[in-house]
Amino acid sequence: METVTVNLVSTPAQRGYPIHIGANILTQPELILDYLDQKRVAIVTNTTVGPLYLEKFRADLSVHGMVSVPIVLPDGEEYKNWETLNLIFDALLTHRCERNTPLIALGGGVVGDLTGFAAATYLRGVPFIQVPTTLLAQVDSSVGGKTGINHPLGKNMIGAFYQPQAVVADTSTLDTLPDRELRAGIAEVIKYGLIRDPAFFDWIESHIELLLRRDNSILTDAIKRSCQHKAEVVEEDERESGMRALLNLGHTFGHAIENAMGYGNWLHGEAVAAGTMLAAEVSRRMGMIGEEDVDRVRNLYVKTGLPVIAPNLGPEKYLHLMGLDKKVQGGKMRFILLENIGRATVHADVPAAILTEVLTECTADA
């Protein structure tokens, strides 16, 4: 088992939490017992993950005297909304869960985001633990404290920063992950190489076949290195007032794609990949990177089985949706662009003509 620690500095105390990574660690409840302040927990999962892991997880906890309240949600990005959030609140209130009743998120990014937001707001804050079961959640969404729900007008527009007490990433759960979900998770792994670690990008290029074959040692290494990058960024900028925005490479375009195409039709990682290609092309046309770098990014996505051409929504639709992006400041859209493979920067001065050209010439009818 590998452990990465997120160290958060705040006044007057320093906070932190572990990210445990390894095979079959879901069967080791002792990893989280220290964070359970009472003998009752609420476990939030969904209709896909629940049948696979919920009852065994509950049984392992019960050996240590823990009573668990199961909360099973419908599965899918389209359910990341107020109605589903209220299902969690209804269950917590019905079972009279208290302020020190921990919530455990057992599932992918949607379950984690919903559970975290419920934990941040139920009784004005209760403890929660992330147990991510998808690659995307293990390398990205379970770490850093971003929680929330979607709104019909925009993705993740309602939420809170609320850190978990621990993250338990069992790589064995990836054995039951559909291939499409695995590829979508690799998109977020690639992102770390693009924004801050060229050697990691090289490593992904040379190990992509093993990642796709789910080689456990390679997956564990990729998850650990991704979490190390995420932890370092979050430690420096917990509330996304500066460098944490770089983690949104491809997301400005990608969130617009997810919204326009209907939540759940494009997986988040798929939209991020297509969005990153648009960001790379904007970077090239602004003279920041060369065609060779754009080709490297495209080729890696193609090898991964990710989309490299964004849907043609029309420039007006894209610009409207991106105008609702959380990074907008003073009415100006801010884009994460590439200076080279391994370095990204934030830009609020992208010429409208270049944006329009890219959104016209580099998209295709879905």
From Swiss-Prot:
- List, alphabetically, the SUPFAM superfamilies matched: Dehydroquinate synthase-like
Question: What's noted on cofactor binding?
Answer: Binds 1 divalent metal cation per subunit. Can use either Co(2+) or Zn(2+).
One of the record's GO cellular component terms: cytoplasm
Provide the catalytic activity annotation: 7-phospho-2-dehydro-3-deoxy-D-arabino-heptonate = 3-dehydroquinate + phosphate
Q: Where in the cell is it found?
A: Cytoplasm
- EC annotation? 4.2.3.4
- List the pathway annotation: Metabolic intermediate biosynthesis; chorismate biosynthesis; chorismate from D-erythrose 4-phosphate and phosphoenolpyruvate: step 2/7
Q: Name one Pfam family in it.
A: DHQS_C
Keywords for the protein's UniProt record, in alphabetical order: Amino-acid biosynthesis, Aromatic amino acid biosynthesis, Cobalt, Cytoplasm, Lyase, Metal-binding, NAD, Nucleotide-binding, Zinc
Required cofactor names: Co(2+); Zn(2+); NAD(+)
Family designation: Belongs to the sugar phosphate cyclases superfamily. Dehydroquinate synthase family.
| Annotated function | Catalyzes the conversion of 3-deoxy-D-arabino-heptulosonate 7-phosphate (DAHP) to dehydroquinate (DHQ).
State the protein's name.
Answer: 3-dehydroquinate synthase
